[in-house]
Design a protein with these regions (language model features):
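His/Asp/Glu-rich metal-coordinating catalytic cores
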Residues: 57-154
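N-terminal active-site segment of His-dependent metallophosphoesterases
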Residues: 1-66
Length: 154
């Protein structure tokens, strides 16, 4: 059985109430997810979007997440993710950068198999475009399948 930690809406970089302490809390919370994944020896960490609070995360936040993803990579734990509404842009997202470095995998309609589970992903889609959404998934070559999305779809 595939064991994962599923998380989302971590909003690294969010300075809630304009408080630097709250900003640090969001970073620590993401670090805790990573440490739990390593301590538990899970097969993957699955993130359902809004890793960052902003479309243009500040360098200290990018570096903190980069360090956390390196720790996962060093432990042999893949980081699978989709893009959320707080970080979606027309020209590219943080996930493209981390995928390019080999530290993350952007989930899509093509399955990513981890153990006995095929993972698929759907980035955030604005509500105005959801009725026209055509999304076809490849049949999984796995015992189980999971679709990770950011947003509510019916």
């Amino acid at each position: 059985m595939t064991r994962v930690i599923h998380t989302g809406d971590t909003h690294v970089g969010y300075q809630q109430y304009h408080s630097p302490e709250r900003r640090a809390d969001f970073r620590r919370a993401f670090d805790a997810v990573v440490e739990d994944a390593i301590d538990e020896g899970v097969d993957a960490v699955v993130h359902a979007g809004d890793l960052f609070h902003d479309r243009r995360p500040e360098l200290p936040d990018l570096m903190a997440v980069l360090s956390a993803l390196r720790r996962l990579d060093d432990a042999g734990i893949p980081f699978l993710a989709v893009v959320g509404n707080h970080e979606a842009t027309r020209t590219g997202e943080w996930l493209d950068l981390f995928e390019g470095t080999g530290l993350a995998t952007r989930l899509s309609e093509a399955p990513v198999r981890i153990g006995d589970t095929a993972f698929y992903g759907l980035d955030w889609v604005p509500e105005s475009r959801r009725d026209d959404l055509a999304y076809e998934l490849e049949a999984p070559d796995a015992d189980h399948a999971a679709l990770v999305s950011h947003g509510l779809f019916t």
